[in-house]
């Protein structure tokens, strides 16, 4: 059956798996311990008002974002909303491009590729005609976790 708000209020400890959203957990007002490690969760804001939540395990989070990114005029743009527990959008800490043919990883200079809104622009000038995995890495120092999300850049 369905879980009631009353049942949510009884939760003290919870381990979550195979989740993409924390929606509904805002009703677990007595939650003290939560383990959401290894999930594809991008928004932790439903936890914002859980005052008793002192044990949060969220390291790491991440996954593959469906769909492909295509370059236009030698520029590929990627925007992803990763929201921390306080409802604040996190900016990527690093952007890594992998060449699928050579298996080389290239970490881009954050200052050159991210604007103030967190939109990542990758200059594809000089890229081979190939598929490139793009890794966006986020870090929340307050709750001590990192998130890594992967996009596929289609430069064919």
Give the ranges of each region predicted by the language model:
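LRR flanking "cap" motifs
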Residues: 1-24, 92-94, 99-128, 134
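Hydrophobic anchor residues at the C-terminal helix/turn of individual leucine-rich repeat
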Residues: 5, 25-28, 47-50
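Conserved hydrophobic position(s) of the canonical leucine-rich repeat
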Residues: 11, 31, 50-53, 64
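Conserved hydrophobic beta-strand positions in leucine-rich repeat
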Residues: 11-16, 32-36, 56-59
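Canonical position 11/12 of the leucine-rich repeat
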Residues: 18-22, 39-44, 61-65
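Acidic, glycine-rich calcium-binding repeat modules characteristic of RTX/beta-roll
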Residues: 35-48, 53-57
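Solvent-exposed, low-complexity, repeat-rich "mucin-like" stalks and linkers
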Residues: 61-101
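Short beta-strand elements
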Residues: 141-156
């Amino acid at each position: 059956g369905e879980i009631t708000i009353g049942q949510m209020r009884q939760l003290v400890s919870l381990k979550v798996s195979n989740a993409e959203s924390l929606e509904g957990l805002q009703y677990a007002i007595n939650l003290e311990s939560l383990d959401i490690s290894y999930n594809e969760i991008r928004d932790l804001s439903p936890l914002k008002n859980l005052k008793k939540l002192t044990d949060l395990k969220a390291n790491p989070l991440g996954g593959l974002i469906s769909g492909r990114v295509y370059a236009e005029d030698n520029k590929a743009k990627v925007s992803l909303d990763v929201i921390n527990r306080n409802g604040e959008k996190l900016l990527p800490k690093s952007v890594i491009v992998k060449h699928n043919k050579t298996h080389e990883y290239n970490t881009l200079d954050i200052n050159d590729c991210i604007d103030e809104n967190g939109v990542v622009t990758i200059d594809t000038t000089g890229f081979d005609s190939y598929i490139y995995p793009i890794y966006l890495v986020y870090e929340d120092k307050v709750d001590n976790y990192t998130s890594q999300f992967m996009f596929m850049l289609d430069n064919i």
